[in-house]
Design a protein with these regions (language model features):
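Conserved short "hinge" loops at termini or chain/domain junctions
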Residues: 1-67, 122-148
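A structural signal for short hydrophobic/aromatic patches embedded in well-ordered alpha helices
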Residues: 39, 70, 109-110
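Short, hydrophobic/amphipathic alpha-helical patches that form generic packing surfaces
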Residues: 45, 68-84
Length: 148
């Protein structure tokens, strides 16, 4: 890209600790590269579609100062994807020792985490776009740097 430096798959995996050795439940990565790339596009698309419309970004032009928000929102989308999968496949399994277990019951925790982080991103996007719109209409205060 040569611009601000987009998120990388490695950064997302590191935030999630999504490595085969770390996922003791199944010994494999949880998210494919394609799922991660798709999840990376969703926060930017949401930001661009948030009113007031006008300023838009892509993976290359997303401001570096907002990188952590993009990363958190990407993780939220991956957690939502996983929550839907776990919810769809949830079932109780009786083990030989008589213990009922279902690793897919984690969907509730994934869903809750995802919704909280995504809602925070949505509120931030709305406030940031409003500030950008205000600055675009009235300029900046005390210098040449925008207030966002």
């Amino acid at each position: 890209c040569g611009c601000n430096g987009p998120l990388t798959i490695s950064q997302v995996r590191m935030k999630l600790r999504d490595y085969a050795g770390e996922n003791d439940a199944w010994g494999a990565i949880e998210f494919s590269d394609a799922e991660i790339v798709n999840a990376m596009t969703l926060p930017i698309n949401h930001f661009n579609g948030t009113t007031p419309l006008g300023v838009t970004f892509d993976a290359c032009t997303w401001p570096q100062i907002w990188q952590s928000r993009w990363l958190d929102a990407t993780v939220a989308q991956l957690m939502l994807t996983a929550a839907y999968n776990y919810m769809r496949n949830a079932r109780n399994i009786q083990t030989a020792g008589g213990v009922t277990e279902d690793r897919n019951q984690r969907w509730k925790a994934y869903m809750s985490l995802s919704q909280g982080v995504w809602q925070e991103f949505q509120l931030w996007a709305k406030a940031t776009k409003a500030t950008m719109n205000w600055n675009g209409g009235f300029g900046t205060l005390g210098g040449t740097s925008p207030l966002y």
